[in-house]
Swiss-Prot record:
It is an enzyme of class 6 (ligase). It comes from Moorella thermoacetica (strain ATCC 39073 / JCM 9320). This is GMP synthase [glutamine-hydrolyzing]. Residues 11-201 form the Glutamine amidotransferase type-1 domain. Pathway: Purine metabolism; GMP biosynthesis; GMP from XMP (L-Gln route): step 1/1. HAMAP family: GMP_synthase (MF_00344). Homodimer.
Length: 516
């Protein structure tokens, strides 16, 4: 796993107490040039200390410190001398553990809030006396623990920040990791560099060196099979493994029949000719579609596709002779969204939740703890083509989760044509790299329309386009009206069985980016 070989390098650990955005904390720390990992809150103290972290951050979470079964830590951690920053629930836990008082508020404080800095403190050094921050909490600290000073407050939160510099213990009730706290990154940097004394020398280049060495240790003299999709994730994973083991890597590209228009041919050209890797093309489209016949539940679709993927790779491995490892381009958001002990499952990812328990190949997931923007930087550093590095994310289950309900050949053809128009027009408008994802969704219901002099009863197409940095939060893209008009007009006129186009203007949260 990434980071296991970084015992002698500086690392800041984020203890996960269950908030869905907790991985953003690790991302912001890495943006400051400090390597960070998120680990379970109940990781044994000896394991935490063995990592020799320069600092520890307690994340937010949905629990109340007084709830039965609320997440707890070994209180000896406070006496370890390691600097600790508690965020939201993390600060409340610190206050509760060390003798402060936490109470339930009559109402939640949620959203943008003005923070008044009330005392000198390393976290706020050089910042204005009043700054905007993002709050999301029900409980609040009414009295800090002995030895702590209150360093900030808001209109509804008397202890919005507190610190005990002598023990290097700090807490903030707001969320510095989100962009709605404009000075949040500066606050985190002050904790990292002023309090923890970090150097900030982690980089993409150092990651590549560490990961190549880790892959070589894991693989030894074994042979490796890569699950290649042509997307940036599997492409960068393949390039990393190829750098580590060379021609002992065979890339298998499976056409599951759920790809976009022209995608199978494009991937074969790009990787077989341009990158010089061993590519095996497998057309398993009929097999996948037969398995999906009659299946309407999105979770079942994902698990069926994940299961069949692994089975196909196992069959190819047997054809190739001895193969020991399987590469997947699993990313950090995949792991987080598939659920941890303290975070509810949003949806299972085919790279994570759908793997058969009797899988015969050992997994290599070199990108498992990277965010998408970090993966792109790794890809550029490895010299991958721009059209691969900057390709928009595409889900492993493909169009199966953009067709609501049962997947049929007819629906696939409808969606392929509509999706191709969306991509073509977004590119033509020069917005492709600015938008995180832009695609079409085919719902299962139909609506009434009029085309010519005839009444129609046909499918709508849902247009989805979002902006994001990491897929953990996303906002709907404010596409120009004339662009929306062109997309709608072309789809209705060029794609049969479609009589309506609607635009999804829901952010994440409360929605997810994909519809299934």
């Amino acid at each position: 796993m990434i980071g296991e070989n970084k015992q002698l390098a500086e690392i800041v650990l984020v203890l996960d107490f269950g908030g869905q955005y907790n991985q953003l904390i690790a991302r912001r720390v890495r943006e400051a040039g400090v390597y960070s990992e998120m680990i379970p809150y109940n990781t044994p103290l000896e394991k935490i200390l063995a990592r020799r972290p320069r600092g520890i951050i307690f994340s937010g979470g949905p629990a109340s410190v007084y709830s039965l079964g609320a997440p707890r830590i070994d209180r000896a951690l406070y006496e370890s001398g390691i600097p600790i920053l508690g965020i939201c629930y993390g600060m409340q836990l610190m206050a509760h553990d060390l003798g402060g008082r936490v109470e339930g508020a009559s109402g939640r404080e949620y959203g943008k809030t003005q923070l008044e800095i009330t005392a000198a403190d390393p976290l706020f050094a050089g910042l204005p006396e009043s700054i905007q921050c993002w709050m999301s909490h029900g409980d609040y600290i009414s009295a800090p623990p002995p030895g702590f000073q209150v360093t900030a407050r808001s209109a509804y939160t008397p202890v919005a920040a507190m610190s005990d510099p002598a023990r290097k213990l700090y807490g903030v009730q707001f969320h510095p990791e989100v962009k709605h706290t404009p000075m949040g990154q500066e606050i985190l940097r002050r904790f990292l560099f002023q309090v923890c004394g970090c150097r900030g020398d982690w980089s993409v280049s150092s990651f590549i060196e560490d990961q190549v060495a880790a892959i070589r240790r894991q693989v030894g003299n074994g042979r490796v099979l890569c699950a290649l999709s042509g997307g940036v994730d599997s492409s960068v994973a393949a390039a990393l493994v190829h750098r580590a083991v060379g021609d002992r890597l065979t890339c298998v590209f499976v056409n599951h029949g759920l790809l976009r228009q022209g995608e199978a041919e494009q991937v074969q050209r790009a990787f077989g000719q341009a990158m010089g890797m061993n590519i095996v093309y497998v057309d398993a489209s009929r097999r996948f579609l037969e398995k999906l016949t009659g299946v309407t539940d999105p979770e079942e679709k994902r698990k069926i596709i994940g299961h069949e993927f692994i089975r196909v790779f196992e069959e190819e491995a047997r054809k190739l002779g001895r193969v020991d490892f399987l590469v997947q381009g699993t990313l950090y958001p995949d792991v987080i969204e598939s659920g941890t002990e303290t975070a509810a499952v949003i949806k299972s990812h085919h790279n994570v939740g759908g793997l058969p328990e009797d899988m015969e190949l050992e997994l290599i997931e070199p990108l498992r703890l990277l965010f998408k923007d970090e993966v792109r930087r790794v890809g550029e550093e490895l010299g991958l083509p721009e059209e691969i590095v900057w390709r928009q994310p595409f889900p492993g289950p493909g169009l199966a989760i953009r067709i609501l309900g049962e997947v049929t050949p007819e629906k696939l053809e409808i969606l392929r044509q509509a999706d191709a128009i969306v991509t073509e027009e977004i590119r033509r408008a020069g917005l492709y790299r600015e938008i995180w994802q832009s695609f079409a969704v085919l719902p299962s219901m139909k609506s009434v329309g009029v085309m010519g002099d005839e009444r129609t009863y046909a499918y709508p197409i849902v247009l989805r386009a979002v902006t994001s940095d990491d897929a953990m939060t996303a906002d709907w893209a404010r596409l120009p009206y004339d662009l929306l008009e062109r997309i709608s007009s072309r789809i209705v006129n060029e794609v049969r069985h479609i009589n309506r186009v609607v635009y999804d203007i829901t952010s994440k949260p409360p929605a997810t980016i994909e519809w299934e």
